[in-house]
Amino acid sequence: MTEQAGRGGVLVGVGVGPGDPELMTLRALRAVREADRVLAPSSAVDAVGRAESIVRQACPDVRIERVVVTMGRAEASVDAVAAEVVAGLDAGQRLAFVTLGDPNVYSTFSTVAARVRELRPGARVETVPGIMAFQELAARAGTVVLQHAERLALVTALDG
């Protein structure tokens, strides 16, 4: 267990990038390696999620725990994951919750973190930003995303 023991743990949302393990940042690699527990969201207990797959390739010696977050029962599954996280925090653990892209943009992590904060106001929650898919796509295409006074807006496809 890390030095967090006895003082309350910390939940760290770790962005693992858009899918290529080589696009995990050094800070993300360190956060995963230094965690007491690494949690990876999945749609089912026996299904390897994309974030888990990336971490397995980048950090093959790290033990990963799958946490199920199902779209049809999202609220109930988020509650279950949040309860597991709170138990880890109460035990003083450093928990890394890995997610595709960036943990603060359209991420399962942000939903889980919000629920954890409801259950444990004042819980220590940190994020490690990750490279997002649009950044990788622009790099592959050799396209500049924006320059100078141009603006960028992120809009979910769910908006219709």
For the regions a language model picked out, list residue spans one by one.
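Class I SAM-dependent methyltransferase SAM-binding "motif I" and its flanking Rossmann-like core
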Residues: 101-160
